[in-house]
């Protein structure tokens, strides 16, 4: 492929150079043939024989240069045409030899092999430059079966409030059901202890906060005794002294 592209480039260069030389030669010939364009045919004031001789020599030189340019351009064009024809023949011969060496039955097999190789290369490139998505990174929007098959540790479940606070809702309900089913049987000590342990923390806190009030009421000596008076830490301000000092502070008239 590289050799073919280089040959095509050389052909294009030859044709361009040949056309340029041909056009330049034609322009020079027309410059000398058409009257009025050449400087030798312009009228001169002196009209001496020297100017006529010089004009004839210049005209002959320009004609010779034009003929050379036209001939070189035509030769380059013919050379480029011949080279292009030769390259086309070589290309056809190579294709014929390839068809003869590789029969038609081997063509589909070779195409399958090429397609398999291309698929493998594409897979390798995709695996090399693979970028995971946000869901894959965060392990979300996956089916449970797929997650368990890949890695059972990936399934994340948040703990409940009861498990964090040490409470369990199933045990109190089960104890209540047992009590309702058998009202004649006395409750077991272990079940009662378990029920005490499984009381909510809020209830415990409220009870503990009200215990000191209960003790205070129980420890009162008698109802006739007045309650203890609570005196403020700082004494109240003396308003009389402030009123007496107020007129003294006024400025004199």
UniProtKB/Swiss-Prot annotation:
Q: Where is the composition biased (Pro residues)?
A: 224-238
Note one Pfam family from the annotation.
TMEM51
Where is the protein localized? Membrane
- Phosphoserine: modified positions: 115, 182, 192
- Main localization, broad class: membrane
**What domain of life does the UniProt record list for this protein's source?**
Eukaryota
Keyword Electron transport carried by entry: no
Q: Where is this region: Disordered?
A: 93-133, 164-253
Q: Where is the composition biased (Basic and acidic residues)?
A: 206-217, 242-253
Q: What is this protein called?
A: Transmembrane protein 51
Keywords carried by this UniProt record: Membrane, Phosphoprotein, Transmembrane, Transmembrane helix
Q: Which InterPro entries match?
A: TMEM51
A GO cellular-component term linked to this record: membrane
Q: Where is the composition biased (Basic residues)?
A: 194-205
Which residue spans traverse the membrane?
Answer: 17-37, 65-85
User: Its topology with respect to the membrane?
Assistant: Multi-pass membrane protein
Keyword Transmembrane helix present in the record's keywords: the answer is: yes
Q: Where does the record place Polar residues bias?
A: 164-176
């Amino acid at each position: 492929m590289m050799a073919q592209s280089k040959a095509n480039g050389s052909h294009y260069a030859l044709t361009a150079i040949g056309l340029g030389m041909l056009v330049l030669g034609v322009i020079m010939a027309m410059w000398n043939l058409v009257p009025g364009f050449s400087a030798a045919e312009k009228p001169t004031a002196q009209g001496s024989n020297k100017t006529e001789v010089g004009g004839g020599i210049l005209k002959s030189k320009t004609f010779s240069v034009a003929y050379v340019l036209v001939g070189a351009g035509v030769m380059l064009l013919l050379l480029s045409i011949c080279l292009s024809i030769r390259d086309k023949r070589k290309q056809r011969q190579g294709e014929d030899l390839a068809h003869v060496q590789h029969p038609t039955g081997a063509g589909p097999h070779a195409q399958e092999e090429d397609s398999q190789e291309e698929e493998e290369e594409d897979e390798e490139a995709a695996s090399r430059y693979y970028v995971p998505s946000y869901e894959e990174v965060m392990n979300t929007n996956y089916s449970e079966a797929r997650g368990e098959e890949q890695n059972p540790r990936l399934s994340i479940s948040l703990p409940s409030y009861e498990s964090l606070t040490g409470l369990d809702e199933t045990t109190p309900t089960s104890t209540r059901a047992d009590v309702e089913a058998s009202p004649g049987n006395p409750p077991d000590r272990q079940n009662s202890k378990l029920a005490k342990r499984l009381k909510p923390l809020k209830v415990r806190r409220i009870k503990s906060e009200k215990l000191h009030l209960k003790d205070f009421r129980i420890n009162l000596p008698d109802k006739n005794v007045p309650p203890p008076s609570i005196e403020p830490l700082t004494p109240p301000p003396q308003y009389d002294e402030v009123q007496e000092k107020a007129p003294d502070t006024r400025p004199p008239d």
